[in-house]
Amino acid sequence: MSDFDRVRDYLTALQDRICNVVETIDGQSHFHEDHWQRTEGGGGRTRLLRDGAVFEQAAIGFSDVCGTHLPPSASVRRPELAGANWRACGVSLVFHPKNPFVPTTHLNVRYFRAEREGKQVAAWFGGGFDLTPFYPFDEDVVHWHRVARDLCAPFGDERYAAHKRWCDEYFVLRHRNETRGVGGLFFDDLDKDFERDFDYQRAVGDGFLDAYFPIVTRRHDTPYGDRERAFQLYRRGRYVEFNLLFDRGTLFGLQSGGRAESILISLPPLVRWEYGYHPLPGSAEARLADYLLPRDWLEESRICE
């Protein structure tokens, strides 16, 4: 079996596993699957759960697509590959829970290969996961980062710190001067050793289940009202802004002639903007600002213990 097929098989199995966990936790709605083909080459399967007891919308897609000219968003860090033939596979998800006390989350794990004249000239892994709470709990944020640190540990003492920092630097709304959430892990251009890099991708994909779903279980029954719901929808606007303005995966998909329905499925089903909004000083809504900047969550928790 080729390296690409090994990655592909892992990713399709990961999509299945995550969907099973989501349906079990939600207990009400089920994923609907849409198989699609891309005219330029390849295809995928998009799964969407809507109007659940826990998840307002949970979208998770697998794609295996190819093309003849590497788009600018993929070659900006590798200009020597501009115009090369390419093939990419990946799993990407965004979950928008119903309860404002359950964070939104994102996971992406992908593998990319470039060819010239039928020969592979480059291949690399990328991905990561991040967490976007609206009413954050320190316990949840520390748990999230502990799982991230622990899954990184077999890959060197610097792996967690480096990929956490990369996440903090990537998921930034520069026009708002705030991060998208409390971070996590982000990596790209991982190409030193296929087996080791593939092990890391699997650790990230598998670790996501351990990082996110305990938080969902803890928070999805938390009482909330109209005020919390309105703030959730307002903050979702920031999520939309990042995805449309800065997200590399979104830009790559659109620039490569990808399937817009699948690319934009990450956007929340309901969202609102409000001109000149400022939360009341000292309120739970105002407290969120303290979380939307890079912080060493594990060191802070150690000091507080």
Curated annotation (Swiss-Prot):
A divalent metal cation binds at H96, H106, H145, H175. Keywords: Cytoplasm, Heme biosynthesis, Metal-binding, Oxidoreductase, Porphyrin biosynthesis. It is found in: Cytoplasm. The active site is at H106 (proton donor). GO terms for molecular function: coproporphyrinogen oxidase activity; metal ion binding; protein homodimerization activity. One of its GO terms (biological process) is protoporphyrinogen IX biosynthetic process. Pathway: Porphyrin-containing compound metabolism; protoporphyrin-IX biosynthesis; protoporphyrinogen-IX from coproporphyrinogen-III (O2 route): step 1/1. Signal peptide: none annotated. The record marks H175 as: Important for dimerization. Gene3D superfamilies: Coproporphyrinogen III oxidase, aerobic. Its main location: cytoplasm. Pfam families: Coprogen_oxidas. Its cofactor is a divalent metal cation. GO terms for cellular component: cytoplasm. Its EC number is 1.3.3.3. It catalyses: coproporphyrinogen III + O2 + 2 H(+) = protoporphyrinogen IX + 2 CO2 + 2 H2O. It comes from the Bacteria. Substrate binds at S92, N108, V109, R110, G257, G258, R259. Residues 239-274 are annotated as: Important for dimerization. Homodimer. Belongs to the aerobic coproporphyrinogen-III oxidase family. Involved in the heme biosynthesis. Catalyzes the aerobic oxidative decarboxylation of propionate groups of rings A and B of coproporphyrinogen-III to yield the vinyl groups in protoporphyrinogen-IX. This is Oxygen-dependent coproporphyrinogen-III oxidase. It comes from Xylella fastidiosa (strain M12).
